[in-house]
Amino acid sequence: RESGYSYDYANPAANSLVPLTSGFGLPQANLYIKSNLSDGIYLNFELYLASRHHNETWVKGGFLQFEKMEFLPWDFVDEIMKYTTIKVGQFDVNYGDAHFRRSDGGLTFYNPFMENHIMDEFATEIGAEVDVHVGDFILVGAVTNGKLNNDLTKIDTTRAQTKYSNGVHNPAWIGKLAYDKQINSQFRLRASASGYYTAGSVRNTLFGGDRTGSNYYGVMYNAPISNANFTNGRFNPGFGDKVAAVMGNLFLKFSPVQGFSLESFTTLENAGGRGANEPDVRKSNQFVTDLVVRFGADEDFYVGARYNTMKADMGAAQGEPNHYEVDINRVAIAAGWYMTKNVMAKIEYVNQKYNGFPARSIQDGAEFNGLTLQGSIAF
């Protein structure tokens, strides 16, 4: 359950933003069902019961998960499956590690902050993924359809909207290598490198695949708040067709004594791509780092700070001859309390600034800041 939102903002651009006041956002809820179909075979089914973007219940995705394949008669398959997990269906794209800590509709329990990255790397796509665990190393390989909603329609490259498409619904290829180790009783390390590539999928949503909505309610819109205005505070670089992205993540946790720990999570990302109506590939990059201090008998409390900055090359604005570069910077300070293992509350102050946007844009010289309170239940 989410509650308590208040924002201030400044925008000297020609467009005026919708005035805001303090208030509550509607609750969001998710439902996860994991069914054991057979020994080592599971069906994972995920529903959004209610969200900002879709107020009604609808399916997020579902997939078969194989940890054993005893229906195959070969011993070597049993040996392989001791180290391997296979997923087939529609699932979260396993690009980077940031999606493990993001808020996803009603599931905000694992995010110590209120919001996700400015460039929010999240999509559900149809495909297959293989995870191999060998010692402290994890190797991930996947292929998907490269889009949220599948489309079998032949691509018409004579149309302006798809003029620069290669005319093919290309798959997306995802890879990850991670090292995750509890070095000793006090120190844990996880480092990973990931990549995502599609030669052209026309409707790719790697940076715009969330269908639930931001937790910064109402900011940065010049139209009345509705379920269509749900990406507040985020930025999509518009790589709807060709996409090549790489991400590095580093997680460190130091626990010198019982009931106290320091943890840090850092993301470095570089991406390039274009829409099907663009001739040139554009670039974007993002850097995010946070520090969280946990304390209390069972680390029931925490305080944290996050810095997020991104830059992106954008196509020429309407009426303008040249490309332009934008950057957005965010600072967030948060605190939280795990009242039980299933119930938590958190509060965050955020300040976000926009630079380099065209004069016709509501982001030109824009800034918002404010305080948000949120309650979360997971069971």
Over which residues does each language-model region extend?
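Outer membrane beta-barrel
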Residues: R1-E2, A13-N149, G167-S185, R190, ...
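Short alpha-helical hairpin
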Residues: R1-P12, N227
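Outer-membrane beta-barrel pore domains
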Residues: V18, F63-F66, F187-F379
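Short aromatic-enriched loop/helix-cap "lid" or pocket-rim segments at secondary-structure transitions
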Residues: H99-R102, T153-K154, R203-F207
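Alpha-helix capping and helix-loop boundary segments enriched in small/acidic/polar residues
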Residues: I118, Y164-S165, I362-Q363
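Short, contiguous, pocket-lining structural segments
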Residues: F122, A142, T162-H169, F235-A245
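A short, polar/proline- and glycine-enriched secondary-structure boundary/capping micro-motif
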Residues: N150-L152, F357
